[in-house]
C-alpha cells in the first residue's frame, strides 16, 4: 500500500487499537505464552535499548503506547506491506515464508531501501480484512514498512547486541 490507501489503512488500525471493544487478537501464537531465558533477557534488552534511544522510561505507558501505535502506520514509511500465508500450511512452509521475507528485505536493500518487518499486524487481522482482500483461508503473518531510512530518527541508531557465533553454531570437522 502507498498514498491515500496507506493513510486510510493506518487510521483504521489506530482506531481498532484504541477501541476497548475491538477484538485485537492474533490467529496464531506468535510468541510463547511465557518467555524464558535466555530469550526473555535478550528481548527485554533490545526493547529497553530502543526505548532508551526514544527517551521512553519504564512505566511511561503513554509514550510506550504512542510508540507501539507507530507500528500501525508503518513508522511513517511510504510503503506498507501485509503478508499472509494459507492457514493449512505447516511449519516447513512458515520457514520458507521467513526466507521469502528475508529476500524481500535483501532485494529492497539492493535498491537503497530499508525495511522493518513488523509482528504487530497479526493482532489486527479482522481490521486488516476491512481494508485489503485477505481470504478466510489465509492468516495475517506480519507487516513490513519500506522506504528510505531517516537516519536522523533515534530508533535508526539502534544496533542490537548479537550473540557470539560460538553460542549458536557448532563446527564439526
Spell out what each predicted region is:
Residues 1-173:
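Acidic, surface-exposed loops and disordered segments
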Amino acid at each position: 500500500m502507498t498514498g491515500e490507501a496507506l493513510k486510510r489503512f493506518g487510521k483504521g488500525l489506530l482506531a481498532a487499537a484504541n477501541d476497548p471493544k475491538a477484538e485485537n487478537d492474533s490467529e496464531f501464537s506468535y510468541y510463547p505464552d511465557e518467555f524464558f531465558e535466555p530469550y526473555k533477557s535478550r528481548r527485554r534488552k533490545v526493547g529497553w535499548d530502543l526505548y532508551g534511544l526514544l527517551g521512553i522510561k519504564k512505566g511511561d505507558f503513554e509514550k510506550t503506547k504512542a510508540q507501539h501505535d507507530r507500528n500501525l502506520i508503518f513508522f511513517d514509511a511510504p510503503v506498507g506491506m501485509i503478508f499472509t500465508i494459507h492457514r493449512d500450511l505447516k511449519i516447513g512452509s512458515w520457514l520458507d515464508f521467513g526466507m521469502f521475507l528475508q529476500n524481500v528485505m535483501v532485494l529492497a536493500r539492493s535498491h537503497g531501501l530499508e525495511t522493518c518487518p513488523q509482528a504487530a499486524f497479526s493482532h489486527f487481522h479482522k481490521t486488516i480484512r476491512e481494508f485489503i482482500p485477505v481470504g478466510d483461508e489465509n492468516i495475517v503473518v506480519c507487516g513490513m514498512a519500506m522506504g528510505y531510512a531517516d537516519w536522523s530518527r533515534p530508533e535508526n541508531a539502534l544496533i542490537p547486541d548479537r550473540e557470539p557465533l560460538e553460542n549458536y553454531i557448532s563446527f564439526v570437522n
